[in-house]
């Protein structure tokens, strides 16, 4: 928000930073949860788009949620904090994998999608419930056999619509679901040389959805060779 921002450093430490009118750092406080240690070098965390006081952080195969990060005062401290954190009682099925990407919904609120380091995608339908199950929505066919999920993007107008990006070279890179992960379609279109994902296509890294009007949307994909745009998602025929 306008009073403070969050940033992380390598190894997963998350810092709440207070900024002054000139955008300069006035004070800071470390806020990542006590008990969380299995962080990646660059560790995923996101703010909830509906309630910015809710924070989601991955830790290996686990998910941590802070239900009200605003209560942690900024006093230049550098210790992990216990306030309002819980670890979801469930975790991704293969604990040798780790959560590599997070995507949260606007409408309805508090749905969370998780991507992993080895092709799997999960859905949590109530992220504020510490016992909410992680539903495996990975298709039995179609996804890369061992792809790395680098981005999960949820349509802010409809939480049933979600994109998954695989950043590996030589695999099909972009999938889209309109039914909360029940089915998936390939939508990388002309960004792939072949429909299998083989060939000289770039590595896709991220996707962002920008609603324009009630009937139009802009989609942006970040790749190893630049930024691409489309306004129409049309399965294999999508033109970026």
Q: Residue locations for each model-derived region?
A:
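Structural signature of eukaryotic scaffold interfaces centered on beta-propeller domains
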Residues: 1, 38-50, 95-107, 151-158, ...
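Beta-strand initiation motifs
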Residues: 22-29, 71-79, 129-136, 182-185, ...
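Loop/turn-rich, solvent-exposed surfaces of beta-rich toroidal or solenoidal domains
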Residues: 157-160, 165-172, 191-232
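Conserved Ser/Thr-centered positions that define the repeating blades of beta-propeller domains
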Residues: 8, 16-21, 45, 65-68, ...
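Surface-exposed loop and turn segments in beta-propeller and other repeat-based domains
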Residues: 27-37, 78-95, 137-143, 189-199
